[in-house]
């Protein structure tokens, strides 16, 4: 159950079609914002600064927008599943000590993975380590540092006892490599940088993993190669679901299986619909002669043209989540050059998508077969009046997934992503991230060879630009964004690095140093102060707190506050704990710095038996 559950942070278990949980991680980051301009500009997905409260803007299940409540509920469910194993494993007869310890180690992994998420998304939270026999309503919050100490100890045990993937009969279950990755993050979060580097050294040099540097596996030609041709390349192959978990992929450390046709084996993942642009919007995107810009012709329609079948080639996006300009352009600059040779940002091979790669396909238009234009060449008027939702670049190699149900239906006018019977296998950890974690550890240690680890990832992507001097933490986080889009939990990682910077005393790329006692206890929407997370979101993302944007006939004002580094502790959890008091996060209603907390995990564990 734990292994199946972990994939539901990426794709929602009930297959809601317009959003998925992982998108919340990008909304609260430098890489994306909410794009549904057909909803009210007062929606909390736009107005995070004022709309996100312990009782408002806090969704667990909805078709659009963020899933903050989902992360709280499902993460404690994951902890419950892990604790079930840990609570009852002694009652299982016939297990030798190695097998028993391997199961304990796997359970520790799932619990540690969950608490790593909780402490960097919610701050200080209740520590639950056992299955209770009756309701407990007097929890205290446990301080983040104490929880990190506990999960670090647990992961040291897990690395010792969980077997390598090569010695496991099951793909997608916890393995030693995955445990090392999580332990490295635990060491970074507890200021043990040399130990973090050592774990990454083992992964990179001693366990049989290697970066994939040439084409491999099965070549997937894409949705319609006559419309959108793909030149086979290693980055394209690396991110095809059919190649992620195969034995020849030496880069995979730990993956998540999502394929088949049953609810246990497969959850649909409509990536193209959710993360792709609304290129066929009939009201807001026109050709210069006033016709609809893009049409989603079915294959049995007389207007269909296989050379202009963008429906199958790139899917029918609705722009629920829009990448920031930074994610589309700025972050791809190294040495002052936007590196379009980089296979991850390369439209020539078909990996990267730009609106000007799409062609008008409305029959009767004088612009039929010509490339999309943002402005009318005759008068410079905008041809797209909803540039938030309809007009942006996207990483096609990441979001393209075959829609096998639509492909089997010649009348289909929706191609959304992985559908029932298809594949959406995903990476949890791969070796490229180990290089970037090692670079981060070296940064804190003042080791100039951090640039070599970043450049190893860039060299594999055939980048024209490499780093030549000392890399900053910003360079490392930029490379994470380029390499790990829709893999990493971006908000959580920015929050983790914000804490690591404060612990280390190192300055960020903006020249700021942070105090561990104050970095996460600030509020306001101005540029003064705030955490590293806030600086990245506002300065790099460059959409939040920048004033009004007009799109689709409405004025949108994206706002986010310094205190939104952490999500609020949900009011339902506070009310349910009516014999005790949980610490609410700074900046939200109910914050009280005098609230008692556990400052070590041992006392918190002892208290679990009290009612």
Language-model regions, residue ranges each:
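An aromatic- and glycine-enriched ligand-binding surface/loop that stacks and positions planar moieties
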Residues: 1-44, 187-373
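Long, intrinsically disordered, low-complexity segments
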Residues: 3, 61, 75-76, 150, ...
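Conserved, well-structured interaction surfaces
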Residues: 3-10, 14, 32-122, 138-146, ...
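TPR-repeat structural position
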Residues: 148, 193, 447-448
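C-terminal substrate/ligand-recognition segments
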Residues: 315-455
């Amino acid at each position: 159950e734990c292994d199946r559950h972990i994939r539901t942070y990426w794709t929602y278990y009930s297959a809601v079609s317009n959003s998925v949980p992982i998108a919340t991680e990008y909304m609260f980051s430098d890489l994306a914002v909410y794009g549904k301009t057909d909803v009210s500009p007062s929606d909390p997905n736009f107005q995070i600064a004022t709309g996100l409260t312990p009782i408002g803007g806090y969704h667990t299940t909805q078709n659009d927008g963020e899933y903050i409540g989902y992360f709280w509920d499902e993460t404690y469910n994951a902890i419950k599943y892990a604790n079930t194993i840990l609570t009852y494993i002694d009652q299982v007869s016939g297990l030798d000590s190695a097998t028993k310890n391997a199961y304990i180690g796997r359970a520790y992994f799932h619990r540690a993975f969950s608490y790593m998420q909780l402490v960097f998304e919610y701050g200080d939270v209740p520590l639950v380590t056992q299955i209770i026999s009756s309701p407990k309503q007097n929890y205290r919050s446990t301080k983040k540092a104490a929880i990190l100490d506990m999960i670090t100890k647990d992961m040291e045990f897990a690395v010792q006892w969980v077997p390598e993937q090569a010695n496991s009969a099951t793909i997608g279950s916890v393995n030693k490599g995955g445990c090392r990755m999580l332990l490295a993050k635990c060491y970074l979060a507890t200021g043990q940088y040399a130990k973090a580097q050592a774990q990454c050294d083992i992964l990179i040099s001693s366990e049989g993993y290697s970066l994939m540097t040439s084409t491999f596996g099965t070549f997937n030609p894409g949705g319609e190669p006559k419309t959108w041709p793909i030149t086979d390349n290693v980055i394209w192959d690396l991110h095809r679901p059919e190649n992620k978990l195969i034995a020849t992929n030496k880069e995979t450390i730990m993956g998540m299986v999502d394929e088949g046709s049953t609810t246990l084996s497969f959850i649909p993942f409509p990536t193209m619909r959710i993360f792709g642009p609304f290129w066929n919007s009939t009201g807001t995107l026109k050709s210069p002669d006033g016709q609809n810009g893009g049409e989603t012709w079915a294959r049995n329609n007389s207007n269909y043209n296989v050379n202009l079948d963008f429906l199958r080639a790139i899917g029918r996006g609705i722009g629920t989540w829009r990448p920031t300009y930074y994610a589309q352009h700025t972050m791809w600059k190294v040495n002052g050059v936007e590196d379009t040779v980089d296979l991850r940002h390369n439209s020539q091979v078909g990996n990267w998508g730009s609106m000007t790669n799409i062609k008008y396909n409305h029959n009767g238009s004088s612009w039929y077969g010509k490339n999309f234009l943002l402005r009318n060449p005759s008068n410079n008027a905008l041809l797209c009046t909803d540039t938030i939702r309809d007009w942006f670049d996207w990483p096609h190699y990441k979001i393209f997934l075959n829609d096998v149900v639509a492909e089997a239906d010649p009348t289909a006018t929706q191609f959304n992503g992985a559908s029932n019977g298809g594949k959406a296998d995903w990476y949890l950890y791969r070796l490229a991230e180990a290089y970037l974690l090692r670079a981060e550890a070296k940064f804190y240690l003042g080791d100039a060879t951090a640039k070599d680890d970043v450049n190893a990832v860039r060299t594999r992507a055939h980048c024209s630009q490499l780093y030549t001097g000392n890399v900053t933490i910003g360079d490392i986080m930029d490379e994470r964004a380029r390499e790990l889009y829709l893999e990493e939990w971006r908000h959580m990682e920015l929050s983790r690095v914000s804490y690591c910077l404060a612990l280390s005393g190192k300055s960020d790329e903006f020249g700021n140093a942070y105090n561990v006692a104050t970095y996460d206890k600030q509020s306001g929407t101005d540029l003064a102060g705030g955490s590293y997370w806030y600086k990245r979101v506002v300065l790099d993302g460059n959409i939040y707190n920048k004033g009004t944007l007009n799109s689709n006939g409405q004025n949108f004002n994206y706002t986010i506050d310094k205190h939104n580094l952490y999500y609020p502790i949900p009011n339902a959890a506070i009310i349910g704990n009516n014999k005790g008091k949980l610490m609410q996060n700074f900046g939200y209603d109910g914050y009280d710095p005098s609230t008692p907390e556990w400052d070590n995990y041992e006392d918190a564990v002892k208290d679990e038996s009290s009612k």
